[in-house]
């Protein structure tokens, strides 16, 4: 392995010539973006193609759907195609489908009912393509199956119903668990694991040879319940008593669900419970499961302690059921992100390895780790970060990935050889651009997606030749022509330097008819959460922010600033906010606003800030500083006190209340002077059916402000009946954005020398100072 380590110093291969000239969305016409074109979603936007690649004898094959609904097997290189499922065999109103690996059958999901962000209930049917027969996965199903997945090699399907695990094989079904119920989840995550750990709806994993199934069991017994009332409940006439949804929702320092690791032998139905001893049961989070073999020899899980600042990778030998910690890490200088990036690659110079991403060096990079434990091998290094692994090609010994090597706001696609350690760009990595790629099943081809800042496009390449595209997949020529009719906002990117030395990325939008000799109102639009990124070179969506920049009656300048704590600028920059969320972030937004005001065109009397979710929290914390810089603010679906938010997200960054009581008290929005002293107004928007950031946050915040003396001319609270975190129920999003537009219009019209005054206030002043107050 010395060979690999020495070659780490090998040079990076020469960058290729870009395949086409850039096509900046400069407009050039006279039309201005309108409200209806931008809100609630951008109607003028780039198109993109996403392919369902198929692993078959021919590389480059994928499934598409014809205009009449038939499913077609196509080869993207040869343009040959074959109808696999005729239109009359496609179930009406289906939600999704998955082909059996040998393409002999299709699993359909129908009768979709949404549950949480990723999960849903459905009926499932199996279509035998040769026979044309459609068979229900469960004869008595009633739209109640939670998840189903084909085995990678045979006729088996694992599915979850009623929180119990079942195995279907050629028409025969075996129930493998009997304890599923309201508090026990087999093979699917509960709410908090779905939302904060896996970001998906399953917790089961077939071995590569299909002989074993690893799955997790979650026990919510004792986890506190949160009740969400639904006042209309999607009915024309509201029920006399609201429907109440009870969710086991662990808040900070409350009891978390416990988790167990299980192995199931598919053929024998023998189940084994694997003791998880990496951390005590009440101090354990399992973040990832991955098979570390080409068959079923070993499987591993990533374990964290409760506050997710210590990590252990535990390998399990399937035959002996023996567990071994093969890697561990202390991340108590901040937190450890769950990147879900482990992938087995097999033999390298006589030793088995898997690949993973770690920021232990201070920057997120790719490493090879021995399956049985031992010294890791760094494949990438430097003061930049690997964002995602796109593909592992074990035959060519190449790992394809995206990174921020050029700049933290950019993404370029590279390959790195774990045989020679040579890193090669697949794109021109000397330009400010944002790329990603989708690789065919065998890795012979890829669709390169250029996503900004110019007009996006997609091209097909062979991995044998990254210099010349085989064809254009999506040109977006029509979008380019459409944009030529418009005079668009002027978008630019730059950095500002903090007194402490760090730099903050800024995205600025100027009105299309910007005149540096005029005064312009400004709206800051942060998100600002840990590890997030808003300022990037990706396509500038022509959304609400572009609308308020373009409307002649508004003409706002917008600034989006990625504060400390946000992503892709290294671990130190991220971890600075640990244990005190909202403190440095608010300081950075205030600093940026003061830098903005060095521009003569910035109207100091009309500087606003609007954010959603964490951005709504950050808006409130920024106004709380009472800096005098911001004159109005809008918080949409904000957290107001992280003691009211879920444990697995919050404790990752704040630890528990017992460990950080003062930090939680300071993080809560509790100081009212900044709101009382606003020259303008503060608006809170929240959905009453929000199962993520509960409406409780807005209720507590508005009560804090009202009881603290914030007057009615400074504060408005708007709720949206039964809407979730996205505020999409009924016509809520339409009303919401109209309210936002009215808010920024009213704030622009506000005159500091003569603020709007209600007749009651006029009468009070008249009584105190005489009739002159009425003038």
From Swiss-Prot:
Database matches in PROSITE patterns: PRO_ENDOPEP_SER
Catalytic activity entry: Release of an N-terminal dipeptide, Xaa-Yaa-|-Zaa-, from a polypeptide, preferentially when Yaa is Pro, provided Zaa is neither Pro nor hydroxyproline
Glycosylation sites: 81, 111, 170, 219
EC number: 3.4.14.5
Ribonucleoprotein found in the keyword field: no
Subcellular localization, as worded in the UniProt entry: Secreted
Highest taxon of source: Eukaryota
GO molecular function, one term: aminopeptidase activity
The protein, known as: Dipeptidyl peptidase 4
Organism of provenance: Trichophyton equinum
Originating gene: DPP4
């Amino acid at each position: 392995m010395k060979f690999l380590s020495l070659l780490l110093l090998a040079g990076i291969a020469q960058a290729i010539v870009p395949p086409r000239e850039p096509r900046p969305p400069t407009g050039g016409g006279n039309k201005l973006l309108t409200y209806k074109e931008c809100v609630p979603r951008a109607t003028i936007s780039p198109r993109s193609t996403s392919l369902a690649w198929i692993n078959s004898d021919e590389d480059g094959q994928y499934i598409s759907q014809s205009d009449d609904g038939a499913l077609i097997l196509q080869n993207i290189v040869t343009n040959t195609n074959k109808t696999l499922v005729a239109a009359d065999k496609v179930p009406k109103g289906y939600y999704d489908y998955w082909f059996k690996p040998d393409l002999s059958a299709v699993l359909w999901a129908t009768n979709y009912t949404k549950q949480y962000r990723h999960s849903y209930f459905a009926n499932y049917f199996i279509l035998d393509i040769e026979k044309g027969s459609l068979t229900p996965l469960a004869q008595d199903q009633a739209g109640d199956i939670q998840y189903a997945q084909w085995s990678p090699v045979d006729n088996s399907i694992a599915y979850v119903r009623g929180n119990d695990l079942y195995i279907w094989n050629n028409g025969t079904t075996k129930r493998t668990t009997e304890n599923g119920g309201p508090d026990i989840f087999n093979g699917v995550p509960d709410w908090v694991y779905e939302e904060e750990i896996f970001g998906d709806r399953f917790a089961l994993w077939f071995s590569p040879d299909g002989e074993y199934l690893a799955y997790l069991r979650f026990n919510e017994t004792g986890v506190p319940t949160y009740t969400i009332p639904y006042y209309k409940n999607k009915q024309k006439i509201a029920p006399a008593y609201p429907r109440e949804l009870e969710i086991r929702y662990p808040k900070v320092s409350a009891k978390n669900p416990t988790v167990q690791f299980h192995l199931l032998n598919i053929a024998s139905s023998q189940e084994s419970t694997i003791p998880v001893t990496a951390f005590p049961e009440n101090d354990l989070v399992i973040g990832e499961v991955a098979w570390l073999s080409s068959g079923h020899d070993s499987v591993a899980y990533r374990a964290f302690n409760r506050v997710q600042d210590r990590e252990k990778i535990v390998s399990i030998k399937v035959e002996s059921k023996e567990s071994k910690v093969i890697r561990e890490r202390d991340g108590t200088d901040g937190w450890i992100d769950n990147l879900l990036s482990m992938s087995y690659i097999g033999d390298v110079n006589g030793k088995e390895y898997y690949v993973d991403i770690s920021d232990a060096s201070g920057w997120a990079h790719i490493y090879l780790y021995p399956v049985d434990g031992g010294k890791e091998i760094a494949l990438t290094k430097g003061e930049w970060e690997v964002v995602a692994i796109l593909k592992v090609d074990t035959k060519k010994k190449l790992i394809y990935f995206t990174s921020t090597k050029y700049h933290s706001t950019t993404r370029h696609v590279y390959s790195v050889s774990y045989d020679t350690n040579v890193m090669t760009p697949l794109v021109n990595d000397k330009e400010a651009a944002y790329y990603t790629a989708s690789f065919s099943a065998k890795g012979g081809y890829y669709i390169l997606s250029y996503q900004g800042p110019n007009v996006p496009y997609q091209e097909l390449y062979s991995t044998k030749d990254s210099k010349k595209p085989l064809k254009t997949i999506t040109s977006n020529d029509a979008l380019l022509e459409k944009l030529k009719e418009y005079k668009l906002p002027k978008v630019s990117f730059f950095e500002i330097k903090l007194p402490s030395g760090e730099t903050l990325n800024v995205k600025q939008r100027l009105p299309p008819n910007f005149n540096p000799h005029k005064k312009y109102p400004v709206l800051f639009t942060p998100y600002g959460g840990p590890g997030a990124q808003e300022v990037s070179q990706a396509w500038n969506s022509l959304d609400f922010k572009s609308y308020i920049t373009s409307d002649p009656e508004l003409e706002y300048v917008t600034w989006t600033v990625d504060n400390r704590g946000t992503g892709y600028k290294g671990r130190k920059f991220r971890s600075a906010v640990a244990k005190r969320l909202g403190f440095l972030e608010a300081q950075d937004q205030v600093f940026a606003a003061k830098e903005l005001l060095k521009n003569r065109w910035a109207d100091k009397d009309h500087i606003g800030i609007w954010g959603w979710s964490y951005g709504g929290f950050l808006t409130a914390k920024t106004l709380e500083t009472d800096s005098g810089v911001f004159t109005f603010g809008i918080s949409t679906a904000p957290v107001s006190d992280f003691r009211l938010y879920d444990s697995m997200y919050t404790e990752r960054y704040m630890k528990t209340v017992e460990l950080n009581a003062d930090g939680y008290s300071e993080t809560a929005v509790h100081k009212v002077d900044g709101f009382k002293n606003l020259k303008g107004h503060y608006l809170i928007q929240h959905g009453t059916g929000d199962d993520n950031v509960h409406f409780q946050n807005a209720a507590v915040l508005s009560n804090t402000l009202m009881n603290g003396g914030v007057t009615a001319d400074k504060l408005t609270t708007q709720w949206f009946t039964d809407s979730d975190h996205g505020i999409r129920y009924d016509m809520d999003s339409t009303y919401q954005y109209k309210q936002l537009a009215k808010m920024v219009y009213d704030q622009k019209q506000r005159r500091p020398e003569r603020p709007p005054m209600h007749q009651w206030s006029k009468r009070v002043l008249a009584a105190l100072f005489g009739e002159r107050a009425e003038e």
